């Protein structure tokens, strides 16, 4: 059973992309949370999924997905598979999803959940999301569900010219900014950066990010 009520709620709270709302309506968030939290899955709030990680607030998931402006033929890199809920949503909205998760237990769990539900256009990789997935780059879009302290140039370099990245950036444990970054069309031009929302995401772990 999907979340038709959630899609209606999100529509009334500012999410306008009909494709995003339809995809959310097709998914049941309770399928992606620990069994003892399934009764809480209907709430518009983040929930713990173990190993210090969370499944994000549904409104934030929808906002991030809408900001990618997916049309259906994109190749998308996801940093932080987590529960697999965001992965499933992206899978319904683009051609291919490449998802990286650093926590082995979460990577395995998400792979199993999405496999049971028949998602076939998702490739998984266990490892350091701060490095992206260089051998599959470039991507039309990148979505990160963990926050580095600064904009990671390693990930930005894996976008196609004109590609979009949605990423929370800011201090560990503090308020971060959810950014929409569009890579310039021509070498030497400055990317376009827009702040969408103040958020608090788990930190992006892994090796230090290269800034040049």
Swiss-Prot record:
Single GO molecular function: protein-L-isoaspartate (D-aspartate) O-methyltransferase activity
Protein location: Cytoplasm
Name of the molecule in the record: Protein-L-isoaspartate O-methyltransferase
Alphabetical list of InterPro entries matching this protein: PCMT, SAM-dependent_MTases_sf
Record's keyword terms, sorted: Cytoplasm, Methyltransferase, S-adenosyl-L-methionine, Transferase
Alphabetical list of NCBIfam families matching this protein: pimt, PRK00312.1
Enzyme Commission number(s) of this protein: 2.1.1.77
Taxonomic source organism: Myxococcus xanthus (strain DK1622)
HAMAP family, per database record: PIMT (MF_00090)
Keyword match Plastid: no
Gene Ontology annotations of biological process type: methylation; protein modification process; protein repair
